Amino acid sequence: GFLWVTGGDRHRGICPQDNSLLCGVVLRVDGNGNAHPDNNAPRADKRIYTYGHRNVQGIDFDPATGRAYTAEHGPWHNDEVTALVNGGNGGWDPAEKRGGRTACPDKYCGYEPNQKDGMIPAIRAAYTPMSDTRFTDLMKPAWNNNGYSQGTGSAAFLTGSNWGIYEGRLAAGIMGIAFGGTPGGLRIDMYDIDADGQSIKSVVHMPLGMEKRFRGLRMDNGMLYAST
């Protein structure tokens, strides 16, 4: 078996797209910390499986295919669920003076333009996109949060016949960050993802009868454990 490790961009603008830095990445390593021999990211560090990430909070594996899926925080827009591709690029590039941007505080454009009540999410998202289509190796997200960032957390595939029509769906906890005109949304979402991992058929809010910041999800013997 191999260990998968997710890492954020550390508020360094050049990190996610830089070829030499170990941040904004997903690693696949063995028990000694060595790279999986099939890792294919175009990086100097062969432990890297994918790069170009902002803040991956959840990762789990489709029980039918073994494919890895991540749940990731957006900055102030577009939380995402993405099917990982070996060597693929998440498309996050918060560096200044790229993509038509000028200088940014701390040389980090991830929070620009600044959060403002009533700002149209699409306008904010266009300035520093979560999945920038400039990159030819972009991994297209299966789902984004309609332009909002509400704090997508841990993720787990639902397994067991007791889940009925929801068996095989990916569940993700939403921590409900509500400010600057963003709706709250403390919940667990269940995504019915297309077989190609490029889109979803539907998303359903799990009827829990309560609102909590769901930080961790884990499946065990057909039961979903959720930590708050």
List each language-model region with its residue ranges.
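Beta-propeller domain segments
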Residues: 4, 9-204, 222, 227
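Short loop/turn motifs that cap or connect beta-strands within the blades
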Residues: 205-209
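Repeated scaffold domains used in trafficking and secretory/extracellular systems
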Residues: 213-215
